[in-house]
Amino acid sequence: MSPQTETKASVGFKAGVKEYKLTYYTPEYQTKDTDILAAFRVTPQPGVPPEEAGAAVAAESSTGTWTTVWTDGLTSLDRYKGRCYRIERVVGEKDQYIAYVAYPLDLFEEGSVTNMFTSIVGNVFGFKALRALRLEDLRIPPAYVKTFQGPPHGIQVERDKLNKYGRPLLGCTIKPKLGLSAKNYGRAVYECLRGGLDFTKDDENVNSQPFMRWRDRFLFCAEAIYKAQTETGEIKGHYLNATAGTCEEMIKRAVFARELGVPIVMHDYLTGGFTANTSLAHYCRDNGLLLHIHRAMHAVIDRQKNHGIHFRVLAKALRMSGGDHIHSGTVVGKLEGERDITLGFVDLLRDDFVEQDRSRGIYFTQDWVSLPGVLPVASGGIHVWHMPALTEIFGDDSVLQFGGGTLGHPWGNAPGAVANRLALEACVQARNEGRDLAQEGNEIIREACKWSPELAAACQVWKEIVFNFAAVDVLDK
């Protein structure tokens, strides 16, 4: 036996594989105020006990690996390891469990959503011992929240910038989303803003294509904004999509938007990435730009109930990374979104403090301390008949965004904007008078039609358009 071998043997290191639950399943653990807490929906492979599955998640998303390593002795695993501290069976689902995991704060870089997600939703999602794994919720402790800038400005600052209070903001995505020249695109922006909308928007896949380069679009949209502001006396905006192939190009586009004096830019935060998004959010705060966030790609991640990441987690991550608006679904439109679930993460976007409420899918109490709030954006398959429900569901601190529901008006873009603005003001007035929007919504819209031929025409076009499909992602019974 060589001297080296004798030395290793004398250390007493015992190589091999041991069950994760021996180290990482700790039901006696008392969580700390500084821990990041996670709720995972775990579906183990046949024959894998839930305790072992939960412990494997804790291990593989923190300090563990598939075998014992001698370098474990060079650090304090008890200080740094994740711990599965509770497991609940999911009622009504076969072989599904909610595993609660606590992570010490020292595992994560300050102010980095990228680093947090790399650990918590990293390689563990491909672990063979699990048939499926979904991150349902995270509790971000105040100590970690305070390391983030968050939204560039927040809800109150945005209202002050726009000088608009007491109602939801009104927007429109320019359609067709691809193919228009920059000049025709700017014309549509002008017509919608002149008709009464607060914002118009680039679609998420409008970047800088051969038919419309970004600089041309920015120039024509800025001209449209200033012309509409002059004619209406209201502050207007267009979400100029700064998303690009590199962070440097993205910031270059944001700089040009600032030089034009426009109020807001836009980013696709999931396809663009959290590092790029946080960089843009910091630039926007430093330079007085509002930041609209689109969630393109989210349904690839969040739609399936047993695997992926729930949107409430992606919403929390966005509030930390930074954005003043984010698309949140509509409940009543063409996109996925159950009412209770949607209102749960809408509160997580807007409110300073949100209590645990499993009836809305909120697994943990969340204290955002002083982090500014984010306006939810209801967009996707909505029209004037939806206005009472949208106003009742989302309240004043929201953006209601009608793309086809504006540009599909039979008389053109400006009349479509007029119809939406009048429908919104009728609903806000009725609500302020004490009327029940949920029960009297259709009647309120019909009454308003008497004063607006534009609204009457819109109501006639979309009177039979509904999207009656059951939601895929629903609350557990």
Curated annotation (Swiss-Prot):
Its EC number is 4.1.1.39. GO terms for biological process: photorespiration; reductive pentose-phosphate cycle. InterPro entries: RuBisCO, RuBisCo_large_chain_AS, RuBisCO_lsu_C, RuBisCO_lsu_C_sf, RuBisCO_lsu_fd_N, RuBisCO_lsu_N_sf, RuBisCO_lsuI. The modification N-acetylproline is found at P3. The disulfide bond which can form in the large chain dimeric partners within the hexadecamer appears to be associated with oxidative stress and protein turnover. It is found in: Plastid, Chloroplast. The basic functional RuBisCO is composed of a large chain homodimer in a 'head-to-tail' conformation. In form I RuBisCO this homodimer is arranged in a barrel-like tetramer with the small subunits forming a tetrameric 'cap' on each end of the 'barrel'. This is Ribulose bisphosphate carboxylase large chain. It comes from Nicotiana acuminata (Acuminate tobacco). The gene is rbcL.
